[in-house]
């Protein structure tokens, strides 16, 4: 089967799904809303999201519940996308699904650390997916992080997490987080190798960029919040980055402070976009999402009969959810409309 034939149907479906994205004009109207409830009413009455909110009491929906509703819809759309593929391509997208599954694992483990009684499956976005193969009920029934990790015995997750110390603190959670990311990208890179050459090259570039940006986050957080040694931080960085190779990684890890870290970063492709020494953390996250968004929009425009359109849709849909939930959250506070623009991961003309 040619690439044109393979992608004709799925790209047509994806383009139809993309038309449901919010327009810049709709974003402007959300920003102009007076409060959280007004935003919900606008989403319900003036956008495609109204179909998702049907049947819910808008007066009772909080930010977390809205994010859950949006993510459950995303997972359904993800399943629709996978339906178009078979063989190694279906395996590839199933590996991508692991990214959301491990978020649910993280949610449970963090709950065990904080003492939150998160024993409700309805808080998890992947538990009822046909792609899910984890026993979340068993994890939720445990009393602490150590027991929850042992509840994963027999799964790929357990192989990576079993050596994590039973010490329950923020640093342990950080180690769990980076270990899960290492696991995910290890499996993802293996599945990419099974794609055809064109798609393999595209995905290696995309994933290599993600690894670069994730490594920057690891290094920054390890230095600022956990005071980890350069050796420890370097040990947790991921291999396979596109633009930041081992020599540059070492310089970043061994930089003495955030200012020197940023100076080394300026000598990379990302330095002028990601500014840790200047911006607050939420602005850095916004800039990273903006960079990712621009990459996918460019790929979608330049590549037609390949994997770019599908992956761009899946990633841009996630960014839209982040934009919506960010705006919803800050509508609780009295922030000028002009200031709200800086929370979005793209520019509004």
Predicted regions and their residues:
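N-terminal domain-start signal
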Residues: 1-349
């Amino acid at each position: 089967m040619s690439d044109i034939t393979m992608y004709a149907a799925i790209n047509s479906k994806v383009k139809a799904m993309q038309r449901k994205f919010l327009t810049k004009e709709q974003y402007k109207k959300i920003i102009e809303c007076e409060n959280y409830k007004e935003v919900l009413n606008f989403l319900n009455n003036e956008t495609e999201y109204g179909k998702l909110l049907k049947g819910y009491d808008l007066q009772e929906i909080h930010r977390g519940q809205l994010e859950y509703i949006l993510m459950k819809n995303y997972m359904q759309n993800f399943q629709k996308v996978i339906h178009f593929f078979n063989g190694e391509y279906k395996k590839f997208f199933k590996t991508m699904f692991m990214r959301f599954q491990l978020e649910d694992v993280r949610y449970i483990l963090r709950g065990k650390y904080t003492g939150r009684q998160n024993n409700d499956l309805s808080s998890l976005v992947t538990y009822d997916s046909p792609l899910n193969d984890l026993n979340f009920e068993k994890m939720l029934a445990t009393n602490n992080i150590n027991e929850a990790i042992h509840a994963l015995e027999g799964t790929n997750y357990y192989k990576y997490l079993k050596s994590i110390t039973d010490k329950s603190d923020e640093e342990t959670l950080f180690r769990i987080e980076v270990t899960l990311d290492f696991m995910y990208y290890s499996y993802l890179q293996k599945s990419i190798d099974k794609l055809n050459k064109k798609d393999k090259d595209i995905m290696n570039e995309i994933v290599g960029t993600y690894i670069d940006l994730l490594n920057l986050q690891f290094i920054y957080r390890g230095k600022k919040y956990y005071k980890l040694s350069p050796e420890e931080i370097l040990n947790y960085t991921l291999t396979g980055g596109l633009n930041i190779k081992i020599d540059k990684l070492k310089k970043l890890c061994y930089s003495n402070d955030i200012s020197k870290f940023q100076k080394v970063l300026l000598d990379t492709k990302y330095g002028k976009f990601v500014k840790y020494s200047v911006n607050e953390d939420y602005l850095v996250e916004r800039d990273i999402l903006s960079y990712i968004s621009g990459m996918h929009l460019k790929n979608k425009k330049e590549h037609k009969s390949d994997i770019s359109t599908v992956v761009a849709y899946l990633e841009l849909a996630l960014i839209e959810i982040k934009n919506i939930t960010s705006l919803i959250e800050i509508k609780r506070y009295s922030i000028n409309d002009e200031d709200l623009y800086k929370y979005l991961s793209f520019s509004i003309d």
